[in-house]
Amino acid sequence: MRYIVSPQLVLQVGKGQEVERALYLTPYDYIDEKSPIYYFLRSHLNIQQPEIVKRHILLTLRMTQLKGYLGNLLDIKDDIIIYSHKNNLEYSYVDNTIFNPFVYTQKKTLLKNDSFLYNVYPGACDFLVIWVARACDTSIPEFGSYEDVDNNIIKFETMLMEVFPQLDLDITVESKFNNIFRTNLKLTGLKKIIQRVQDLDINYKSLLSRYDEHFINMTGNHFILNDEQLNLSIWDLDGTLALSSDGDTVMINNVKLFTDLVSDIDTQMERIKGDITYKVHLATPINSRIKLDIETSFIFIETATNNILLSSDKKISIILAKNHISIKVKNHIPNIEKYFTFLVIAINAMFNSVQKSADFTKVETVYWSRICQNTKNKNRKPIIINYLDPGMKKISNNFYRSDEKEVFINDNGIMFTCMDPLGKYNKVGFLNIFHDMWKYCIPCCFLHDQSHRSTFSSCVHQIDVEKKIVSPYILNFGKVVTESKMSFLPIIFDAFLNDGMTANMEQDNKRLKETSGYHIVRCCAGDDIVRLRTTSDIIQFVNEDKNILIVNDMVYFPMNASDIGKKIHILIQEIVHEVMIVKKKESSDKIDFFPPNYKLLKDLFPKQTIQTPIQSDAGMVLTTDGFYIDGKLFNEDLSSKYVTFTKNVIASDAVAKYFSPLFKYVISEAKDRFIKTWMINIMIHMNVDPNNIIPTLEKYYPNSGRAQIN
């Protein structure tokens, strides 16, 4: 989708707040009559023909920088005050009401601000209106000031307007954002919401549950037990979680539904700060090694890594790649990721157009000296030649081969070959690490033919292998693993699952050389990211997926041993990953993946192979294999049309402490967990002495998992 840079409006007003000038700022040559700015001009200010100015206010400016810019824009040499009818800019009141310099106020209540425009005006990417008044025309002239314009800002803006017609702003945005808010709903608000769901009869599955120390009181038509004392969960018609709240916080995935449900509730909302990551795909590649040729600290701060930028307030980080940009922000600002992408694309057009690689003798020598170097017995550094030998076979447009030598020709026409005096390192290949990171084809000399390598295919045959090839470098556990990466397991599971297995790594780094089989972590297959935020989410996922899931030091199983599949999943930063066995030969970069040895964990399942009755009453029988009514297994979904109450038995802390970890390795379907809770109550009813708790449980569940681990 093509990103449209929104117009901006600057209004200069006189003593009576009458509009003296209305400047419509846009990088385009016309007025967008569908824009909110034009609607505001026409409908609220009754201005049909503003001044069209081909300029643009950078949303990254501080208030003092903005003030200097506006003075230059309007050609005002006097002290000015800037303000807005939507947000507080330069000044604000202590109660955060909107500041207006023409309204009488107690001056001691004014607070001065020099923050960044996009922070104080969160909607600025889509709708920016700034009012400017001469200080002498307002009721507080002493609060006005004059700021000199930063000439670098004007220089940058001029260059921006020059390159703007050339920019390809066709982008696609993926986001993983923080949608959790603090709220004042409490139990009363949650009851109103669940009542409204039922009154509207919208067929959304819902659950309002309230638990005491040992669990349960519940209503709703979707039963999932979690570890929060109070929880409201509502699911969309397609089964995805629309919203979840414990009364103090709320996670919102369906904004429209939530808005409809709380329309008659006085709801206070405050977004909980947390990182939001946007991945912006570019239709036209950029140069990821950005270099700024003028002062641009009013937009970005350059870092030691030339493909990473920081915003001026250091709260937004931008990672550049050839075909996409990753933007991480601390809090949600509407469309800020598109705006920063626009600035990055513009800067690339100004200073960093995609260039051909320079000669290796001028730039890449540093890489040769570090990685592809000559030693006493190894001659790995290629040499430059001026011509091809007669009779050499053309392999591709940039690679030739004969019985004696191989020649690679780079984008600048420089010819490289390998001529080892010892006759060993005569095969031309390429350094993987720099190709993986920056797509640089840096030649090096090898013992064996390299044509089977993925990097060779990319550099010589221009075959895009980015998504097909997995890097042999193994990351430390804890980071989200992308499609082309893999990581180690946590130490405890690495030792457990890889007992007796080995992986040979290259010396001094974590690059896999060879293994006949080793458990690692990969991203899950497919394009959909599965995110599990709460225990309820984990239970539902394990129940539906019917595979083992590792969360921290916990192992979650489906309820019945017969349901356990052959996959092992693991949760990293709330994202579901997959545990697999990796195999690799030393002679090849090809990495093969195989299913894990799931039986190692499955054997920990606290199973009971023979159905054993635990308690029975009035035709209801609780067994180790489920709950039966009149001899039939109870497997009906619970309905919101009924209310179920379980009166929990009050037990001593000692009893509760012993019961708590005993079901650590078993996570069940919702109704089964309901039964499990009832079973615990029954066992307490059975007056089990704390000293006999474990023997009593092992009577019904001989393979408790606890004994095996110990």
Curated annotation (Swiss-Prot):
Q: Which compartment or compartments is the protein found in?
A: Virion
Q: Which InterPro entries match?
A: Poxvirus_early-TF_lsu
Give the record's GO biological process terms.
positive regulation of DNA-templated transcription
**GO MF assignments:** DNA binding
A GO CC term assigned to this protein in UniProt: virion component
Q: Which domain of life is it from?
A: Viruses
User: Which controlled-vocabulary keywords does the entry list?
Assistant: Activator, DNA-binding, Late protein, Transcription, Transcription regulation, Virion
The record's similarity note reads: Belongs to the poxviridae VETF large subunit family.
Q: How does it assemble?
A: Heterodimer of a 70 kDa and a 82 kDa subunit. Part of the early transcription complex composed of ETF, RAP94/OPG109, and the DNA-directed RNA polymerase.
Described by its record, this protein's role is as follows: Acts with RNA polymerase to initiate transcription from early gene promoters. Is recruited by the RPO-associated protein of 94 kDa RAP94/OPG109 to form the early transcription complex, which also contains the core RNA polymerase. ETF heterodimer binds to early gene promoters.
UniProt name for this protein: Early transcription factor 82 kDa subunit
Provenance organism = Vaccinia virus (strain Ankara) (VACV)
